[in-house]
């Protein structure tokens, strides 16, 4: 039995950076669905199940000619709809077998290739993704975390671990300040506004930021998350992480950094900011790996939670039931951040 709720297949997920997909097919996976992805000669996308129906060779090892994907074993070629168009060696008068490969809807937003693993569902990715201006993007990166998608997303959206896992870089446990978190559900997920903390106690804030007027966390189903920082000078920084589960224990993470209203050329971000962000990522990956190993060691047990775990319930609900909360939900809590 598949571990994923059927409703999850109707959503869109990023599977690759668009600048890294050309005419040479690549194998990608989401929700335990294996797909061959390539760019066609006309600039479109071809996304087919990574299995030729002839002798089950991987289509991702094949090649693209014009707008068709050819199998590496016997050359059977299929169009973007998965229809068989050619069998090399078959006489012209010979009839093509009535077979096809499962095809997947694909599109591009904010420099990423998005796929919908289900035959039906949403027409396009969520509004958070569609509203993002690619012209403000300063950095993009793809990695894979050794974690369940809920654990991975909670890690990014949860500020309470930063005093320990990222001690000194993001926050310091000895320099907590009172803050208020306002949780509100939305049509696509939820937002959490943090008030009372115009600055952070870590090195990253001191080096690269100025006084904040707003700090907000976003979740838009299925796997889009954002940390939004608004500054007193009118500028804004968006750190977007889009999560795509390959399997129950491995999650692709697509990172985009957007900067609005302040000087931040791409070269400066890569040279000055990226080394620190890479360190933060390594710290998170190390803890997520330890967490996953310990879950396997002790078996799946439900974790104890407090009101500080403000995002966990909504994430678990969506990924287990495929549903968001009904109606508008609001709650507020006090915390030492």
Question: What residue ranges belong to the model's regions?
Answer:
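Rieske [2Fe-2S] iron-sulfur-binding domain
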Residues: 4-9, 14-137, 189, 257, ...
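C-terminal catalytic domain of Rieske-type non-heme iron oxygenases
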Residues: 44, 123-337
